[in-house]
């Protein structure tokens, strides 16, 4: 789940900019249920700064973006990274390195968010893969791999940019693969 904090040993894999954009990333939802168009799980408009490893600016909604959850206790202050409009410019700051990224193109900014999300998500999931691998290796080492059943369960996975989404609110085929 959010916020995809990966172990430092994974910082050099799945670099932003190397992950292919899904063909449905800019889905307009024309042939989908109304819920698909109304869903609040769009990479371009619904991710918070922490999701992307970015510094959240201080201030109100005009400066820092809309709260992720309105009407919730004041302790939860996560703000959505704004969706860039065609006549705007935005600068965001990497929380890890302090690097500034400036955008004036909404499409490029949405793709930047996708790359940041995917990089962080895949690095985090790599730890799960490695952990399961260690269990299987231990079973081999102990010589009990042939008479041991390993059952791994989870709910459906996150969308990885398909239809422009992150999260797992819909059970579309992509979130099961």
Descriptions of predicted regions:
Residues 1-146, 151-154, 158-177:
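Active-site-proximal cap/lid insertion segments
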């Amino acid at each position: 789940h959010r916020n995809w904090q990966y172990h430092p040993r994974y910082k050099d894999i799945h670099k932003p900019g190397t992950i292919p954009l899904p063909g449905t990333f800019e889905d307009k939802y024309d042939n989908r249920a109304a819920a698909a168009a109304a869903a609040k799980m769009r990479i371009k408009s619904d991710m918070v700064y922490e999701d992307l490893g970015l510094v959240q600016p201080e201030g109100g909604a005009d400066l820092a973006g809309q709260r992720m959850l309105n009407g919730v206790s004041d302790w939860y202050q996560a703000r959505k990274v704004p969706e860039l409009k065609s006549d705007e410019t935005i600068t965001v700051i990497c929380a890890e390195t302090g690097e500034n990224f400036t955008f004036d193109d909404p499409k490029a900014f949405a793709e930047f968010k996708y790359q940041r999300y995917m990089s962080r998500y895949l690095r985090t999931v790599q730890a799960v893969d490695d952990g399961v691998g260690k269990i299987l290796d231990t079973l081999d080492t102990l010589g009990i791999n042939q008479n041991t059943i390993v059952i791994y369960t989870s709910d459906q996975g996150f969308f990885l940019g398909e239809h422009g989404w992150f999260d797992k609110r819909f059970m579309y085929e992509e979130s099961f693969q």
